[in-house]
């Protein structure tokens, strides 16, 4: 075991003392989930927002602070809110995934989320975790250092959250419901957005293009968040270099690049020095799409970096802003090179030895259509997705955490397989058809408190190989290695980075490849692990860990709040 109850107790006690000494604050917010008329792409739609804003409110806190958010649901749909990347030590009831840690907040209902930020600094975000509501229900969560503590890099002249999103010229909930009804893939989005705006390459969008004002010579901290539902994105700024200094609320060794690749769920902090001629420059994002023969939104969203220099400030000048060079949509080499550049800032102590050595396949599959029905998938099938051939089924009458806490039988089992039930050539061009249909089930994997967990995440070429952003709730992890083809423990273990691997909460598993992650199971509760392409979690590309309590109060899940929603 990597941690003992005494060391954990001392850590939490020291955190509590430091919080008192540093004057940690309690932040109270109210989120009203409501329908709001929003005009994009020449049309007005009533979309679900928080407090009538798109994106929603930015939460700004310091490490050690406590956050209390009262979420009131005035919308027509059930809703939950997930605080993406927050560790939620012992406060799993506040994590937010629907039917995992809570039942949804029904229309007319409310729920008060309460949690403390422990040992995290940087950029995270919050979003709905019910159906496809996060298409418009999302916002930034900025964690700054404690008072009298500085960033591990030069203090920026300004900080700007830049949230990448997707926009449907339709109700996203109805888009996914229609896909679930027919078994077909859902309609692709009609635009990408930056801070809620598509940018001036789209119809009826020029005047509202997001602008980032800067001064010549200054350095800005740009906090990128990929909130897109289903698309990894390349990002670049014309004629400007970006220095990456953080990802997923973890600092990194600074490295300079002209292009970012950010998967849904991930965040990337960059420093940009405004050292070019004082005029206007496009900041642009477009798809990185690794799946072969799969439709995707091949448009480009833009914002404008505007030097405060007396140059034109409207969006109709005779000379347009300079445009960046973006990679081709299928440029896996660029995506791979960017991921390889991310490292922890210092040598880290990798947890070990490994207690749980797991191997999970991830990928899309197909269900046979029921007799007498017509289905919209290939050859009259229904799309599905799975981990280790288990297509995850969310309960509907209670949450997994509630069932675990109260010992309610029949909701889940704890026999999720540690390895694929059938071993095969995972990345072969022609995978046998009998492997295409997974088993639908609600299976969890049980972990002892303090156990060291290593997972090989292996993409498969069933239907199509694809880059999968895999997110674990309640945990950060170290990415020890990534590669292509089938993972070979004898050969590929030699590639493990035991010195300065990056720490993240979401890993983009390479298309036709694998990633190896490691973490300590030191947070009791039920924690979802899933693909952050929402179409894939809808199809079942998910599982959950049940982490047992440790010893004593500080290693035990807290009791549920009195206002926890019931199903």
UniProtKB/Swiss-Prot annotation:
Glycosylation sites per record: 78, 148, 187, 203, 298, 330, 379, 389
**Where does this polypeptide localize?**
Secreted, Extracellular space, Apoplast
Record GO biological process: lignin catabolic process
Which species? Oryza sativa subsp. japonica (Rice)
Chain positions recorded as Cu cation 4 binding sites:
468, 531, 536
UniProt signal peptide: 1-24
Q: Which GO terms describe its molecular function?
A: copper ion binding; hydroquinone:oxygen oxidoreductase activity; oxidoreductase activity
**How is the cofactor bound here?**
Binds 4 Cu cations per monomer.
The taxonomy runs: Eukaryota, Viridiplantae, Streptophyta, Embryophyta, Tracheophyta
UniProt keyword terms in alphabetical order = Apoplast, Copper, Glycoprotein, Lignin degradation, Metal-binding, Oxidoreductase, Repeat, Secreted, Signal
Q: Does the keyword Glycoprotein apply?
A: yes
According to UniProt, the name of this protein is Laccase-3
Primary residence: secreted
Enumerate the InterPro entries for this protein.
Cu-oxidase-like_N, Cu-oxidase_2nd, Cu-oxidase_C, Cu-oxidase_fam, Cu_oxidase_CS, Cu_oxidase_Cu_BS, Cupredoxin, CuRO_1_LCC
Q: Which residues bind Cu cation 3?
A: 129, 473, 530
Entry's EC annotation:
1.10.3.2
Entry GO terms, CC:
apoplast
């Amino acid at each position: 075991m990597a941690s003992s109850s005494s060391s954990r107790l001392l850590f939490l006690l020291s955190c509590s003392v430091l919080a008192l000494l540093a004057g940690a604050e309690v932040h109270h917010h109210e989120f009203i989930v409501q329908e709001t008329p929003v005009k994009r792409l020449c049309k007005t739609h009533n979309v679900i927002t928080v407090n009538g804003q798109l994106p929603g409110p930015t939460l700004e806190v310091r490490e050690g602070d406590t956050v209390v958010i009262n979420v009131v649901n005035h919308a027509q749909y059930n809703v939950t809110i997930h605080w993406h990347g927050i560790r939620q030590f012992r406060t799993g009831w506040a994590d937010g995934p629907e039917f995992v840690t809570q039942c949804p907040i029904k229309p007319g209902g409310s729920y008060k989320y309460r949690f403390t930020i422990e040992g995290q600094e940087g950029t995270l975000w919050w979003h709905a975790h019910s159906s496809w509501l996060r298409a418009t229900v999302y916002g930034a969560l900025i964690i700054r250092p404690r008072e009298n503590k500085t960033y591990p890099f030069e203090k920026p002249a300004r900080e700007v959250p830049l949230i990448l999103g997707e926009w449907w010229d339709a109700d996203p909930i109805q888009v996914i419901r229609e896909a679930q009804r027919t078994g077909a893939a859902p309609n692709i989005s009609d635009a990408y957005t930056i801070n809620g705006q598509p940018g001036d390459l789209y119809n009826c969008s020029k005047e509202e293009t997001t602008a980032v004002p800067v001064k010549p010579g200054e350095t800005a901290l740009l906090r990128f968040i990929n909130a897109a539902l289903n698309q990894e994105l390349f990002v670049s700024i014309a004629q400007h270099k970006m220095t990456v200094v953080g990802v997923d609320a973890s600092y990194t060794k600074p490295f300079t690049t002209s292009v970012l690749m950010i998967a849904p769920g991930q965040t990337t902090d960059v420093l940009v020095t405004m050292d070019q001629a004082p005029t206007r420059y496009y900041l642009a994002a477009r798809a990185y799409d690794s799946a072969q023969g799969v439709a995707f939104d091949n448009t480009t969203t833009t914002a404008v970096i505007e030097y405060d220099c007396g140059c034109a400030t409207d969006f109709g000048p005779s000379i347009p802003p300079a445009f960046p060079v973006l990679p081709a949509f299928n440029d896996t080499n660029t995506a791979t090179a960017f991921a390889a550049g991310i490292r922890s800032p210092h040598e880290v102590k990798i947890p070990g030895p490994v207690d749980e050595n797991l191997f999970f396949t991830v990928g899309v599959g197909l269900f046979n259509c029921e007799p007498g029905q017509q289905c919209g998938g290939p050859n009259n099938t229904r799309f599905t997705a799975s981990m280790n051939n288990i297509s995850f089924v969310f309960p509907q009458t209670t949450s997994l955490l509630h069932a675990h806490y109260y010992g309610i039988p029949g909701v889940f089992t704890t026999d999720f397989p540690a390895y694929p039930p059938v071993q095969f050539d995972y990345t072969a061009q022609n995978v046998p058809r009998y492997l295409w249909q997974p088993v639908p089930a609600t299976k969890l994997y049980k972990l002892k408190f303090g156990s060291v967990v290593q997972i090989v995440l292996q993409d498969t070429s069933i239907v199509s190989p694809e880059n999968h952003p895999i997110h674990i709730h309640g945990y950060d992890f170290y990415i020890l290695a990534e590669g292509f083809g089938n993972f070979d423990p004898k050969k590929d273990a030699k590639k493990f980075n035991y010195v300065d691997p990056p720490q993240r909460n979401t890993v983009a598993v390479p298309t036709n490849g694998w990633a190896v992650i490691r973490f300590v199971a030191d947070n009791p509760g039920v924690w979802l692990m899933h693909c952050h392409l929402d179409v894939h979690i809808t199809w079942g590309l998910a599982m959950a860990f049940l982490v047992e309590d440790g010893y004593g109060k500080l290693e035990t899940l807290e009791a549920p709040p009195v206002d926890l929603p019931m199903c």
